[in-house]
């Protein structure tokens, strides 16, 4: 009896262990942590210019003025744990100063923002080991569309949500709405990762693999956010070491951790497809 149970357990766990071994090998071969470090560095250079460009777009549309404030608070509350208020103050000061920049300065901000998108594109295609490249004009058009339409669509979505919540019938669903609002950051992260893993690679990605990889990345992101905030509030030793500039290493570590999660989700997505391909080849062999 015990021998039968043991054999069944081995039968079910052997594929999982083989897949985990393949995942670990790919992470090592792709130098995932090094890629995450590169993206973290570029992100820190591009973060403020990107936010400046996004909120400059909101400022160009008066209808989004109130929504932009809500989006700003949502981003800093849900995507930058514990130190969001301090970082928000610095970034808002920069955004206010950026409105007085010349055309050359504004062009520099846009180029820096596009640099981040290009780096993400390169890193993900490195993980997928895709040798195919898009035409430069097409890539620029996609980056520009994300940079311009992305914030506007997010603003329109939040505006519609606020309008629906203000309707009379919504008051009868307070409990349901509260639960949905708690899940909203997770759902948003899941959707964002799924789009990232589905659209950015220049090779075909199976939708189910992208959904699974995105879900794991979203769950790790939410768990990591809470764990990181708990560490910062419970063990504030970093403040004794860095003093008033402690927000800088905190932000860098968080951005690096975030990119590790994003790239791990990509590795999971691509490994699911590769493992399935290997199993198919083994089955077809005589």
Swiss-Prot record:
Keywords: Cell inner membrane, Cell membrane, Membrane, Transmembrane, Transmembrane helix. GO terms for cellular component: plasma membrane. It comes from the Bacteria. It is a multi-pass membrane protein. The keyword DNA damage does not apply. Its main location: membrane. InterPro entries: UPF0761_bac, Virul_fac_BrkB. It is found in: Cell inner membrane. The chain crosses the membrane at residues 44-64, 74-94, 104-124, 140-160, 183-203, 210-230, 244-264. Pfam families: Virul_fac_BrkB. This is UPF0761 membrane protein KPN78578_41360.
């Amino acid at each position: 009896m015990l021998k039968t149970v043991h054999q069944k357990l081995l039968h079910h766990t052997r594929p999982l262990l083989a897949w985990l071994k393949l995942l670990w090998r790919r992470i090592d071969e792709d130098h995932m942590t090094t890629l995450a470090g590169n993206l973290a560095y570029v992100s820190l250079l591009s973060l403020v210019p990107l936010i400046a460009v996004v909120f400059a777009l909101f400022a160009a549309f008066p209808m989004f003025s109130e929504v932009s404030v809500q989006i700003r608070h949502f981003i800093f509350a849900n995507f930058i744990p514990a130190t969001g208020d301090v970082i928000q103050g610095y970034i808002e000061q920069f955004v206010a100063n950026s409105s007085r920049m010349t055309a050359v300065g504004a062009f520099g901000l846009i180029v820096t923002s596009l640099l981040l998108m290009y780096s993400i594109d390169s890193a993900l295609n490195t993980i997928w080991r895709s040798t195919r490249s898009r035409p430069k004009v097409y890539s620029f058009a996609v980056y520009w569309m994300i940079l311009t339409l992305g914030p506007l669509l997010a603003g329109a979505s939040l505006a519609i949500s606020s309008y629906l919540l203000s309707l009379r019938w919504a008051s009868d669903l307070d409990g349901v709405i509260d639960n949905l609002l708690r899940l909203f950051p997770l759902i948003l992260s899941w959707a964002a990762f799924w789009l990232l893993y589905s659209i950015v690679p220049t090779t075909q990605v199976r939708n189910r693999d992208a959904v699974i990889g995105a879900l794991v990345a979203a769950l790790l992101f939410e768990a990591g956010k809470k764990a990181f905030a708990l560490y910062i509030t419970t063990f504030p030793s970093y403040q004794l070491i860095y003093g008033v500039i402690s927000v800088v290493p905190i932000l860098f570590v968080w951005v690096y951790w975030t990119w590790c999660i994003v790239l791990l989700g990509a590795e999971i997505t691509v490994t699911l497809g590769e493992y399935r391909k290997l199993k198919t080849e083994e089955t077809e062999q005589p």
